[in-house]
Amino acid sequence: MNKLIVVIISIILMVGIVKVNGQTKINNRPIIGILTQPTDGDMTTFGSQYIAASYVKYIESAGARVVPILYDIDIKSLTELMGSINGVFFPGGGVDFNNQTVYTDTIQSIWSQVVEFNNNGDYFPLWGTCMGFQELALLSADNFNLLSSYNSENYTVPLNFTSLAAGSRLFSLASSSIMQSLASEPITMNNHQFGLSPQTYQQTSSINTFFDVLSTNVDRDGNTFISTIEAKNYPIYGTQWHPEKPIFEWWDQEVMNHSFDSIMANQYTSNFFVNECRKSLHSFSDPSVEASTLIYNYTPQYSESTVPDFEQIYYFN
């Protein structure tokens, strides 16, 4: 990457505001796109793609609105939508990257547009949780075959922070009590079979030159996986853990910490990401088009009997 571009982006990230004609601009009406994914099994009865409602609540709880991004959206519509929203969220899930080329084509297009926006001084954040975290790493490497297997489903642990965490954008604004909770209490919920190993990170220059590692964890078998990342020069962030689950999911077969400390710490991540999206000045030119795209046009279904992992699910066709 051109060194001048890197310097400019770094300054924007550090300052944390956008100036237009010398005036500081903050967008207090952010709209964030959440990517859908294909349904399978019993879920196909209700629609061909879905978003777990907990991700929507997670974004809304921090003061943003949500637009679903259909994973099979055409490139023209995606480009128009990306120019109107203020950030994108890649949720967790179970997509087989090697057998879902439409899905992977879409996340690659989103990634390319996010990088291009920011290279041009157009601040645009991207967040990935669980599978979304994995997607960020794989997209930076342009290789979907870098993940390792882990014994870390239904597994709630504290974070092992690296030396970079305290000075990172993601965690530098967190209170000492939140950092202490994250580091010492079992409040970060993991639910993944695959992950990014430190060895793969170290051996893959396209990943280790793009992302800093802010935390790691060890699975039940003693194998270390990377659990939090932050792009060095872009507003791109990822957690292998699920900050939305302790706040909004209640299945008693999943080990989730619903304590006050857990809620405060996990909610911090949403507050941080939405605040990043306030720095994006994209907007819809037509209010009626904006209204027609919002998640409010859809009704979530109570899903206890079909998919107990989620309290509610939004389905799409």
From Swiss-Prot:
Organism lineage string: Eukaryota, Amoebozoa, Evosea, Eumycetozoa, Dictyostelia
Major localization class: secreted
Membrane-crossing segments per the record: none
GO biological process: tetrahydrofolylpolyglutamate metabolic process
Domain Gamma-glutamyl hydrolase: 23-317
GO terms, molecular function: gamma-glutamyl-peptidase activity; omega peptidase activity
Gene3D superfamilies, per database record: 3.40.50.880
Glycan attachment sites: N99, N154, N160, N257
Signal sequence bounds: 1-22
InterPro entries for the chain: Class_I_gatase-like, Pept_C26_g-glut_hydrolase, Peptidase_C26
Reactions performed catalytically: (6S)-5,6,7,8-tetrahydrofolyl-(gamma-L-Glu)(n) + (n-1) H2O = (6S)-5,6,7,8-tetrahydrofolate + (n-1) L-glutamate
Annotated localization: Secreted, Extracellular space
Protein name in UniProt: Gamma-glutamyl hydrolase A
Family affiliation: Belongs to the peptidase C26 family.
Enzyme category, top tier: hydrolase
Cellular component, GO, one term: extracellular space
Active site: C130, H242
Pfam families linked to this entry: Peptidase_C26
